[in-house]
């Protein structure tokens, strides 16, 4: 047992340099991060994640919690090293801090780590923890997997050669420094009661476990590193400090899906989507909802139905049912383009407002690179403004979540599909993406539209989601059988299931894949099904003009989709002369702001959620392929 007297220097060593008024010590930062991680586990991490981790590692949920909180509490122990402490920026505190360390026997002479060696504090933390775990009797490969969590808390793991060098450096380290490092780990181990749990872990942690615990440690570290929330100088008790800090950050809580669930399908759709009493859910919506409510464990749910059949509402209703059944705390809805994501955002937020319990506050995020141009999302980002109305919960774009790396941690996110597929890549801080997706229901739209390259990433992503026991809902109008079989097999391969072949040629079609097998259910076409006539016309402007005149004589809306921007511009110039004030041009060459304005106007005029004050008797849209994929509008005629 290391003497508690060695904890004193940990309260002198700096973690955050501060200014003349004070600095934050390593010990205080570790205590802050430990306590934040504890709160996040209790109030933010979904029950589905907790149970998945416990089952995977053959531990109790409380034991996984203790391990995660312990690792958060020692993630920066590597800052108690000569090389890090000497990095303190020049200022009024520098001489005082360094002098205090030397006064307690921690010499600051240049060591081997400062002579061309790569020795960042995250790597040092990992090696220090690894050595401590070995002393507890843990097998080396197991200790390496646990230590990798603190090694990666800055987003990327170290190379093996760097790890070996760091071990060599610490083997030659002055004893007093090693004693202080050990004292910090011992104190955190005692505070979290983790030692008996360490003795139970006999095999290496699974990679998904490492990803999620690392994501939690990163989130806790980022919260505790917020100087406004956790000031360097304070005079309150630690519990109050953590409570006030998280409150000032505005961290969202869990979505209590069970509180707003309705057992009757018609009652649910009326409440969740604001439908009038005389509206009935379509058969595909009723069955998708019922199948999700009857699910048992992780499921892949594929909904194949025509455009305009209500797949979006069916998916959201099924997502709510899955969330209630499996303890998920949110929904991610991924669309193929920014335009379709923008169009979905308002619909998802309106649904979320209706399914969040009254008095609760949840976070929302629009996940793509141009979200700053979307007025609906920016409106939610204004602090204190939400869609809260009488009897409904609050859905707000909270400031802490409003960044690319943290956005998917929000309860409700609408994204472009790449934001989900990137979980299959190696990228910095990707653990946060895993943490954000693991506790949710994931909906992916237009899966038939992705090429072979994108589909390969989609299959890898489905494997990750199956590892985390995430319910996944795939939407498609025309999904080829071979692609569906590949997607089903990707998800089920993690569950240890055999290959599967589709046997149904029904349409619309619902497919459920889980550990119990694969079930296909075809449905009768409802009375509101859309039928389309397809014909081929000549490739001249004159024939296009004549066709528009013939088809839209008595009113209606048409979309003319061209293969190139130049062709769209030429067709627009020709049509606008014949139909002034009735033609809009959309294509990818507009600057981002102008494109966002045009897309917003089109969705307001023609989208699923139209302005009641705007009725267009005649309307024509000319655009490139982007307009055809991403319009999300209701049109009577589509030409290509």
What are these regions (language model features)?
Residues 2-20, 24-264:
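Accessory nucleic-acid engagement/destabilization modules that flank
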Residues 265-304:
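Conserved pre-motif I regulatory segment
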Residues 297-319, 450, 476:
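Walker A/P-loop
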Residues 329-353, 366-372, 479-483, 565:
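Conserved Walker A/P-loop ATP-binding site and its immediately adjacent core
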Residues 331-333, 338-341, 550-576, 584-585:
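Conserved strand-helix element at the start of the C-terminal RecA-like helicase core
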Residues 348-413, 417-421:
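A substrate-engagement module of RecA-like helicase motors
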Residues 432-441, 448-521:
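Post-DEXD/H (motif II) to motif III coupling segment of the RecA-like Helicase ATP-binding lobe
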Residues 495-570:
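Conserved interdomain linker/interface between the two RecA-like ATPase lobes of SF2 helicase motors
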């Amino acid at each position: 047992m290391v003497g508690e007297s060695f904890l004193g220097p940990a309260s002198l060593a700096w973690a955050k340099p501060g200014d003349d008024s004070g600095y934050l010590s390593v010990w205080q930062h570790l205590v802050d991060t430990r306590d934040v991680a504890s709160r996040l586990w209790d109030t933010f991490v979904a029950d589905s994640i907790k149970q998945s981790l416990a089952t995977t590692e053959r531990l109790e949920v409380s034991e996984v919690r203790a391990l995660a909180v312990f690792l958060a509490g020692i993630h920066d122990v590597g800052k108690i090293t000569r090389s890090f402490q000497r990095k303190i920026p020049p200022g009024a505190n520098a001489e005082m801090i360094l002098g205090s360390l030397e006064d307690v026997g921690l010499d600051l002479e240049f060591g081997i780590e400062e002579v061309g060696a790569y020795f960042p504090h995250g790597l040092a933390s990992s090696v220090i923890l690894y050595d401590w775990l070995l002393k507890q009797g843990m097998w080396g490969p197991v200790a390496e997997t646990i230590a990798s969590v603190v090694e990666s808390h800055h987003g990327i793991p170290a190379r093996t050669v760097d790890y070996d060098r760091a071990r060599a450096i610490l083997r030659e380290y002055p004893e007093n420094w090693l004693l202080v490092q050990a004292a910090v780990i011992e104190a955190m181990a005692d505070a979290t009661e983790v030692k008996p749990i360490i003795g139970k872990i006999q095999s290496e942690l699974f990679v998904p476990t490492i990803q999620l615990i690392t994501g939690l440690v990163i989130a806790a570290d980022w919260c505790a590193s917020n100087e406004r929330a956790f000031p360097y100088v304070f005079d309150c008790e630690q519990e109050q400090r953590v409570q006030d800090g998280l409150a000032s950050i505005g961290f969202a809580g869990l979505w209590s899906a069970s509180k707003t669930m309705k057992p009757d399908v018609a009652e649910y759709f009326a409440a969740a989507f604001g439908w009038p009493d005389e509206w009935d859910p379509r058969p595909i919506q009723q069955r998708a909802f019922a199948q999700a409510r009857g699910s048992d464990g992780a499921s892949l749910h594929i909904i194949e139905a025509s455009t305009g059949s209500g797949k979006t509402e069916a998916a959201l209703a099924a997502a709510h049912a899955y969330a209630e059944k499996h303890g998920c705390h949110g929904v991610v809805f991924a669309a193929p383009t920014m335009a379709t994501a923008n169009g979905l955002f308002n619909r998802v937020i309106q649904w979320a407002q209706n399914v969040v319990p009254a008095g609760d506050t949840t976070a929302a995020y629009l996940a793509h690179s141009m979200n700053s141009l979307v007025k609906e999302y920016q409106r939610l980002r204004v602090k204190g403004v939400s869609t809260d109305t009488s009897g409904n919960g609050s859905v707000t774009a909270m400031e802490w979540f409003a960044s690319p790396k943290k956005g998917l941690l929000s309860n409700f996110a609408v994204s472009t599909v790449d934001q989900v597929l990137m979980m299959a890549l190696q990228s910095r801080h990707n653990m946060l993406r895993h943490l954000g997706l693991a506790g949710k229901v994931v909906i992916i739209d237009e899966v038939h539209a992705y090429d072979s390259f994108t589909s390969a990433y989609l299959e890898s992503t489905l494997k990750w989601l199956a590892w985390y026991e995430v319910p996944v809902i795939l939407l498609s109008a025309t999904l080829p059988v071979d692609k569906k079989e590949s997607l089903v097999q990707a998800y089920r391969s993690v569950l240890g299931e055999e290959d599967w072949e589709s046997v149904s040629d029904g349409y619309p079609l619902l497919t459920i894949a889980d550990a119990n097998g694969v079930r296909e259910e075809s449905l009768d076409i409802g009375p509101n099904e859309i039928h389309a006539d397809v014909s081929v016309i000549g490739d001249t402007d004159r024939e296009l003009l004549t066709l528009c005149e013939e088809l839209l004589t008595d009113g209606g809306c048409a979309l003319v989709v061209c293969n190139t921007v130049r062709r769209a511009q030429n067709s627009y110039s020709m049509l606008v002369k014949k139909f002034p004030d009735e033609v809009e041009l959309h294509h990818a060459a507009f600057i981002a702001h102008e494109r966002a304005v045009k897309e917003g106007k089109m969705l307001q005029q023609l989208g699923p959620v139209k302005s009641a004050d705007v009725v267009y008797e005649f309307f024509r849209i000319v655009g490139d392929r982007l307009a055809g994929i991403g319009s999300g509008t209701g049109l009577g005629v589509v030409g290509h």
